[in-house]
Amino acid sequence: LKCYKLVPPFWKTCPEGKNLCYKMYMVSTLTVPVKRGCIDVCPKNSALVKYVCCNTDKCN
């Protein structure tokens, strides 16, 4: 997940209200993201799931 070095034309801009980009990983396979998208608040990590969030509304 790149927050500040955007690679055109592939970046995503998040909509109002869900303006943080995030990626979700399973802790057992940290190299393979399970899900990515936009969210309003960065979720807390758990024993099974790790979240990586940007504090911007644009990301790759």
Curated annotation (Swiss-Prot):
Keywords: Cardiotoxin, Cytolysis, Disulfide bond, Membrane, Secreted, Target cell membrane, Target membrane, Toxin. It comes from Naja annulifera. Monomer in solution; Homodimer and oligomer in the presence of negatively charged lipids forming a pore with a size ranging between 20 and 30 Angstroms. It comes from the Eukaryota. Expressed by the venom gland. This is Cytotoxin 3. Belongs to the three-finger toxin family. Short-chain subfamily. Type IA cytotoxin sub-subfamily. Its main location: secreted. GO terms for cellular component: extracellular region; membrane; other organism cell membrane. It is found in: Secreted; Target cell membrane. Shows cytolytic activity on many different cells by forming pore in lipid membranes. In vivo, increases heart rate or kills the animal by cardiac arrest. In addition, it binds to heparin with high affinity, interacts with Kv channel-interacting protein 1 (KCNIP1) in a calcium-independent manner, and binds to integrin alpha-V/beta-3 (ITGAV/ITGB3) with moderate affinity. CDD domains: TFP_snake_toxin. The sequence of the major component is shown, it is called toxin CM-8 and the minor component is called toxin CM-8A. GO terms for molecular function: toxin activity. InterPro entries: Cytotoxin_Cobra (IPR003572), Snake_3FTx (IPR003571), Snake_toxin-like_sf (IPR045860), Snake_toxin_con_site (IPR018354), Toxin_cobra-type (IPR054131). GO terms for biological process: killing of cells of another organism. Disulfide bonds join 3-21, 14-38, 42-53, 54-59.
